[in-house]
Regions:
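Short, glycine/serine-rich, charged loops/turns that create anion-binding
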Residues: 22, 42, 128
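Short, basic/glycine-rich phosphate-binding loops at helix/coil junctions
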Residues: 45-48, 85-87
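Anionic-ligand binding patches
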Residues: 13-16, 29, 53-173
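N-terminal G-site helix/loop of the GST-like fold
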Residues: 16-39
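Short, acidic/turn-prone active-site loops that include or flank metal/cofactor-
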Residues: 39-45
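Intrinsic-disorder-associated, low-complexity terminal segments enriched in Asp/Asn/His/Tyr and depleted
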Residues: 1-4
Length: 173
């Protein structure tokens, strides 16, 4: 019989979340991770425009990496976590809504339809990628009435503009 001993590690590493997203911060907090936050200097729209060859599945991993590397360049001593999520329906990538009218339009386009949420994570240290992961979730939005949509938008308020597709699966749905 082999005996295993737990080893303690005295190495302390600063973890930085390359995002100011309250949802991402809550996920790390709930996981018991001590971290700081930094807003990455990444223009997502410019990156997308500069890379027309990107397929829908390329976008979230590329943006997560860009965010992690941008902050890692400023804090090479830290482990930097970059994240991104895209919503894909019928080969179209949905971005965060520009305004409430755009959110209403996006939600109407998803009504009663299946779509994919593609989430990507990237860790960087010393300006290099040390780990990455991405996953997809297939979801179907239920059919709903115009009155329901009005109530939903009223309940979410400004939060409707902070997430792709205009909905938060981790909250109201």
């Amino acid at each position: 019989d082999r005996q295993y001993r737990k080893r303690s590690c005295d190495v302390q590493m600063t973890v930085i979340l390359a995002s100011t997203s309250p949802t991402r911060q809550l996920l790390l907090t709930n996981a018991g991770v001590s971290f700081a936050t930094a807003r990455p200097d990444v223009d997502e729209n410019r990156l997308r425009s500069a890379n027309p060859q990107w397929r829908p599945d390329d976008v979230a991993p590329a943006l997560a990496q860009a965010k992690a590397l941008a902050v890692s360049g400023l804090r090479p001593d830290a482990l930097v976590l970059g994240a991104d999520q895209t919503l894909i329906c019928d080969h179209r990538i949905y971005a965060k809504p520009l305004d409430v009218a755009d959110a209403r339009k996006q939600l109407a386009a998803l009504r009663g339809r299946s779509h994919t949420l593609h989430s990507a994570l990237c860790c960087a240290r010393n300006g290099s990628v040390v780990w990455r992961h991405d996953a997809r979730a297939e979801l179907t939005m239920r059919d709903w009435s115009p009155a329901f949509l009005d109530q939903y938008i009223a309940k979410l308020g400004g939060d409707i503009l902070t997430t792709v597709g205009g909905y938060k699966v981790e909250e109201l749905g």
